[in-house]
A protein has these predicted regions:
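Charged, low-complexity N-terminal segments of organelle-associated membrane proteins
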Residues: 1, 117-120, 169
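Glycine-rich portal/gate segments that line the openings of hydrophobic small-molecule binding cavities
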Residues: 10, 14-18, 65, 74-130, ...
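A short acidic/glycine-rich loop-to-helix N-cap element
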Residues: 152-176
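N-terminal Lys/Arg-rich, disordered targeting/topogenic segments
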Residues: 1-8
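Short amphipathic alpha-helical segments
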Residues: 49-55, 172, 176, 180
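Hydrophobic ligand-binding cavity/cleft-lining segments
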Residues: 11-83, 208
Length: 209
């Protein structure tokens, strides 16, 4: 069934991409295209204390263990800000979209940090805007994370694809965020000894989802 859906998608993907490329070229040659604006909110619920969740979210060197679609390419310190950093990501689309939409680059400059509670990042690269991450205690001792994305697309091809494939791009975003929530949940559980889940098992399970 999954293979049949992929084949059906493959049959319509090429015309859509062709239309998007033509749209992008025409817009660029003809005088420009309004950028796509994305204003999305995502909520995660993690069964781990807020301080531990914040620590993991602030450790890009650990991210490959629990969020394989958000590939950390480079980490740089932020001058004059010991809590800040500049992280370059290569972001993979959902598997159903990867054949038509290439990975995109995000450069996240995290300069506003309220330890254990909040971070605010200025995003550049193929998207430009702001990502705010808020952490809250749950009554049961877990953590609620709220991501606020407000970005515009700067990559002309991705911008054009966004006009003709908006529902697909939203589904891809939701897939990547669900992967992150599930991966972080499993990673925290393993670290806290709630159950033994090796990092390689987390990555394998997510890759097959």
């Amino acid at each position: 069934m999954a293979e049949e859906r992929r084949n059906r998608w493959g049959g319509v993907a090429a015309p859509l991409v062709g239309a998007a490329v033509g749209f992008a070229v025409g817009a660029i040659v003809g005088g420009g295209m309004l950028p796509r604006i994305y204003d999305w909110t995502t909520e995660w619920n993690i069964d781990a204390p807020r301080a531990e969740v914040f620590r993991i979210l602030s450790a890009p060197e650990e991210q490959r263990h629990w969020w394989p679609s958000m590939i950390v390419e480079r980490v740089e310190p932020l001058p004059d800000n010991p809590d800040g950093r500049i992280i370059t990501y290569r972001v993979l689309q959902a598997p159903s979209v990867r054949r038509v939409a290439p990975p995109f680059i995000l450069v996240s400059t995290i300069g506003d940090v309220d330890r254990d509670r909040r971070t605010r990042a200025v995003v550049t690269g193929d998207l430009a805007g702001v990502l705010e991450t808020l952490l809250y205690d749950r009554p049961d001792g877990g953590t609620r994370i709220v991501y606020h994305w407000y970005t515009r697309v700067t990559n002309p091809l991705l911008n054009a694809l966004g006009f003709v494939m908006a529902p697909v791009f939203r589904a891809s975003h939701d897939h990547v965020m669900r992967e992150g929530e599930a991966g972080l949940q499993a990673y925290c559980a393993a670290r806290l000894g709630q159950r033994s889940v090796p990092a390689t098992d987390i990555e394998t399970r997510q890759a097959g989802s």
